[in-house]
Design a protein with these regions (language model features):
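Small-residue-enriched alpha-helical segments and adjacent helix-cap loops
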Residues: 1-126, 131, 135-139, 143, ...
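An acidic, glycine-/histidine-flanked metal-binding catalytic module
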Residues: 116-193, 223, 337
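Extended macromolecule-engaging scaffold surfaces
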Residues: 176-234
């Protein structure tokens, strides 16, 4: 996090944006080559050939709070295996892998290739966001995900996502020598719930879930987060989980970071609010939607419990999945859908 904060301050616009894939995005980069050098030096760019396809979501609280299984060890194992498979460099940049610990929080992102725990060491194979009916032992998970992704590379003819390929999941399973099953399909969740606030871990320590207005983490706040020197998890809800804290330390973290903009209140309207980049960052936008949304929240016109996405045009970039109220700017003002 120290390296990211320094890069944002020295080479970007002074902040970072958290994305719905748990990634970190820089804007207004003055020297892309220097940025790449810094991130590589910090170990954040381990592969020049596979960087665009290392999109792996995992249940953020896995192994610490709730869940059916602990998927933490599967994350680096899958990442290393993807990078070691030359053919997977040809996956589209929109490809998404997911490792769900059974609570259904990341499978709702409709990954191309994923698993969801159905027991402590048993998983459902998920393709294009749907349960195939195939069940795997934990020892099979990484190999089967690699096989399914490799099959997509060989089958695709320009499709960005497996869901865009005609009969994609069935064809992938056929190439893997597996058959889909209609038995015991997992329920389909509508949306994940961001972990916000004080979260007691199974070992008695504390995780703190902190949201950020508009998913924006400024460099100064990032430096303070890094100084905590505890494991950090970037979630697909544009928030951060600070893990493995003793109670006293957790209380001090809240006292310091809350006034700096980290949101630990699960009732904050910012939990449900998102926006595209808007004007002046996007030429297609009809309004400065981020400022307008910030003003609306400050005025108390937006309440917790209704998900809203503010967009500067009909493209609605950055819109989250699920049931969302769209507030869309046009030439004559905003429309609500």
């Amino acid at each position: 996090m120290h390296a990211l904060a320094g890069a944002a301050r020295d080479l970007g616009n002074g902040s970072m944006e958290l994305t719905s894939r748990g990634n970190i995005q820089f804007r207004s980069v003055s020297d892309p080559d220097e940025l790449a050098r810094r991130l590589a030096g910090a170990g954040l760019l381990p592969s020049s050939t596979h960087e665009r396809v290392r999109n792996i979501l995992a249940s953020p609280l896995s192994g610490r709070v709730g869940g059916v299984s602990d998927v933490r060890d599967l994350v680096p194992e899958l990442d290393e295996a993807v990078r070691a498979t030359a053919e997977l460099a040809d996956l589209p940049g929109r490809t998404l892998f997911a490792l769900d610990d059974g609570r259904g929080d990341v499978i709702v992102a409709s990954p191309d290739f994923g698993v969801q725990a159905v027991g402590p060491s048993n998983y459902a194979l998920v393709l294009a966001g749907g349960d195939t009916g195939v069940r795997l032992d934990e020892s099979e998970v990484v190999d089967r995900l690699l096989e399914s992704a490799t099959a997509f590379v060989r089958l695709r003819a320009g499709e960005w996502r497996l869901s865009e390929l005609d009969d994609g999941p069935a064809r992938v399973l056929e190439m893997m020598g597996l058959s889909p099953s209609e038995a015991a399909h997992l329920p389909v969740a509508v949306e994940g719930v961001p972990p916000i606030g004080w979260l007691t871990q199974v070992d008695g320590r504390v995780s703190l879930g902190g949201a950020l207005a508009l998913g924006t983490l400024d460099a100064r706040l990032a430096e303070f987060v890094a100084a905590i020197d505890r494991p950090l998890v970037i979630t697909p809800w544009r928030s951060i989980v600070v893990c493995d804290l003793e109670e006293g330390m957790a209380e001090e973290v809240v006292r310091v970071l809350a006034p700096m903009g980290m949101i630990f209140d699960e009732n904050s309207p910012w939990i449900d609010a998102s926006a595209c980049i808007g004007s002046p960052g996007c030429d297609k936008s009809h309004a400065d939607v981020r400022t307008d949304l910030t003003d609306a929240i400050a005025e108390g016109t937006i309440e917790r419990g209704v998900r809203q996405h503010w967009a500067g045009c009909d493209r609605r970039c950055g819109r989250p999945k699920g049931d969302v109220v769209d507030v869309v700017a046009g030439p004559t003002g905003y429309r609500v859908f």
